[in-house]
Regions:
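Structural motif
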Residues: 14, 98-100, 129-131, 161, ...
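C-terminal and late-domain segments of enzyme folds
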Residues: 58, 121, 254-256, 268-278, ...
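A short helix->loop->beta-strand "cap" motif at the edges of active sites that frequently abuts
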Residues: 126, 183, 332-336
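Internal gly/pro-rich beta-alpha loop/helix module
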Residues: 138-252
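Phosphate-binding active sites in nucleotide-utilizing proteins
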Residues: 258-321, 325-330
C-alpha cells in the first residue's frame, strides 16, 4: 500500500453505547458473522486498549482485529493521524469496516472525552450507531438516544440498535423513539442467554475459553439477520466520507534480521497485532512458543512476554520446570527481552495465589507477585525513563496503559508513570540495556523507534556485538 492515500473510500461504522455492559461485543460479533455468512469481507477494529474484544472479532473473521487508540498512538493529532492510517491500511480492501467502541461513547481520559470512542469517530469521520440496553424501558429510551446524539454538535450518531429487548416491544416503540430522537432505528436484538459471553476480573473471558463459540456465533448471526436492518447498516456505512491519510511516519529499521520469540498460549495472549507488525517491519522474524506446553525457549535472538492470565495457570507454569529453567538461562545470558504485565509477573521468583500458596516461577527478576481484590494503577499513563535502557534514553516518554488486579513486591523504579488526568505518579518498570519489564503496556505504533531499537539489540546480539 502506498505511504500516502488520498480520498480512499472505506465504508465503515462505529458501534458505541451509553455505558459498558450494553452488549456491544455481542452485537458486533453477530453482525460480523452475519456479514461473513453473506460473503462480504469485514475489517474489525476496537476503540481503546482492550485486548479481549479483538480476540472475539478474530475468531469470527479468521483474520486479525486491530486497536484504534488515540492515547497509545501518541495523543492529539499524532494519535488521530495514526488512527486514520491504521483504518486505511486494514480497512481499504474490505467491503465494510466495523469499529467497536469502548466504555460509554463519550468516556475518555479523566472526566473528559480525550481518547474516547466519540473522539475516534471524530478523528476518522465515522458514522456511529448506538447499541442501547432496552431492558425494562419504554419511551424513556428516547431521552437516552436524544441526549447521546445531541451531547456534542458533531456527535456522528446516525442511528440505534436496541439490545436485550423483545422484537414486539421494539416494534411498538420504534416510531416513537425515531420521532423523539431524530435517529434511524436500525433493529433490535433479543436477550439470548445461551449465547452470552462470561466475564472475569479483566473483562470477558477470552474467545478460546468459550465452549462451542462457533455454534454461538452462528446463532447470533441468524438472529441478526432476523431483527437487525443489516442492509440499512451497510447503506449508512457507505455514506462515510472517503478517508485521507498523510502517510506513516518515517521509519528506519536496522538492515539485518533477528528471530524474536513471542509467548502465545492460554496464559499469555495480550498482544496488539499492529505492534507485532511494527516489530516485523523493524527486522524481527516472529516465532511463537508456549510457556505452558513447550519444554524450552526456541532458538531466538530476543524475547517478548506479553500479558494475559498467568495467575489462572500458576500451577501449570510452575510445574513446567524445564521452560522456567530455559528462560532463566536465556535472561541470565542477557537475551534482549520485553516483559509486559503478565509476562513481567511470570519472570518473578514466585506467585502467591488467593489461597496463599506460593508457586515458583522463572526467578529472573526479584520479588513475588500476588492477586489483590481491586484494580491496581488502572488507566492511561505517560511513562518517563529515568535512565538509559533497551528502549530509549533517560528523559524520553511514551504513552501507555495499566489494567491489572495483581501486584508485585518490586515493581521497579527505572521509569516514572504519570497518571493521565490526575496528579498521581509512581515509580515502575525494571530496565537496563537488555531488559525492560513492568506492568504498563505500550503500543509500538505510538513509538516505532522503540521497536526499532529493541530489534536492533536483538540483531546486534545475533551478530555478536553489544550496541544499542
Amino acid at each position: 500500500m502506498p505511504s500516502s492515500i488520498q480520498g480512499t473510500p472505506v465504508p465503515r461504522l462505529l458501534l458505541a453505547a451509553p455505558s459498558s455492559g450494553s452488549g456491544k461485543t455481542t452485537v458486533v460479533c453477530a453482525l460480523l458473522q452475519a456479514l461473513k455468512d453473506r460473503g462480504l469481507s469485514s475489517a474489525a477494529f476496537k476503540s481503546g486498549p482492550d485486548y479481549i474484544d479483538p480476540m472475539f472479532h478474530r475468531r469470527v473473521l479468521d483474520t486479525p482485529s486491530y486497536n484504534l487508540d488515540l492515547f497509545l498512538f501518541g495523543r492529539h493529532e499524532p494519535g488521530a493521524a495514526a488512527a486514520r492510517e491504521t483504518l486505511l491500511r486494514h480497512g481499504a480492501a474490505a467491503d465494510v469496516a466495523i469499529l467497536e467502541g469502548a466504555m460509554g461513547y463519550y468516556d475518555g481520559v479523566g472526566t473528559g472525552s480525550e481518547a474516547s470512542a466519540y473522539e475516534l469517530a471524530a478523528a476518522t469521520d465515522t458514522p456511529v450507531v448506538l447499541v442501547v440496553d432496552g431492558r425494562g424501558a419504554g419511551l424513556s429510551l428516547a431521552a437516552v438516544l436524544q441526549g447521546m446524539a445531541a451531547f456534542r454538535v458533531d456527535s456522528h450518531v446516525v442511528g440505534f440498535i436496541i439490545n436485550r429487548i423483545k422484537p414486539m416491544v421494539y416494534e411498538h416503540f420504534k416510531g416513537a423513539w425515531e420521532k423523539a430522537s431524530g435517529l434511524k432505528a436500525l433493529g433490535c436484538f433479543p436477550d439470548m442467554p445461551g449465547c452470552t459471553f462470561s466475564s472475569r476480573h479483566l473483562g470477558l473471558v477470552t474467545a478460546d475459553e468459550i465452549t462451542d463459540l462457533q455454534g454461538k456465533m452462528a446463532a447470533l448471526a441468524a438472529q441478526a439477520e432476523k431483527t437487525i436492518a443489516i442492509d440499512e447498516l451497510l447503506a449508512c456505512a457507505r455514506q462515510a466520507a472517503p478517508l485521507t491519510g498523510s502517510g506513516s511516519p518515517a521509519f528506519h529499521p536496522h538492515p539485518g534480521r533477528a528471530v524474536l520469540a513471542i509467548a502465545r498460549d492460554e496464559a499469555f495472549c495480550f498482544y496488539y497485532e499492529d505492534s507485532l507488525q511494527v516489530l516485523q517491519q523493524a527486522g524481527a522474524d516472529l516465532v511463537f512458543f508456549s510457556p505452558l506446553h513447550d519444554g524450552e525457549l526456541p532458538p531466538c535472538d530476543g524475547l517478548y512476554l506479553g500479558g494475559g492470565y498467568p495467575e489462572l495457570y500458576a500451577q501449570a507454569l510452575s510445574q513446567n520446570a524445564s521452560m522456567r529453567a530455559s528462560l532463566r538461562r536465556a535472561l541470565d545470558a542477557r537475551l534482549p527481552c520485553i516483559a509486559e504485565c503478565g509476562g513481567f509477573m511470570y519472570l518473578h521468583q514466585a506467585f502467591r495465589d488467593s489461597q496463599d500458596r506460593l508457586w515458583p516461577w522463572v526467578g529472573a527478576v526479584p520479588g513475588e507477585t500476588f492477586m489483590t481484590s481491586s484494580l491496581k494503577r488502572f488507566g492511561y499513563v505517560t511513562l518517563k525513563a529515568e535512565k538509559d535502557n533497551l528502549f530509549c534514553c533517560a528523559g524520553d516518554t511514551v504513552t501507555a496503559h495499566e489494567f491489572h488486579y495483581s501486584d508485585s513486591t518490586d515493581n521497579g523504579h527505572d521509569f516514572t508513570a504519570y497518571k493521565a488526568g490526575s496528579q498521581r505518579h509512581w515509580p515502575c518498570i525494571m530496565a537496563n540495556d537488555h531488559f525492560i519489564g513492568g506492568y504498563p503496556h505500550i503500543h509500538f505504533l505510538g513509538k516505532r523507534d522503540w521497536a526499532a531499537r529493541f530489534v536492533a539489540a536483538c540483531i546486534h546480539r545475533k551478530e555478536g556485538t553489544h550496541e544499542n
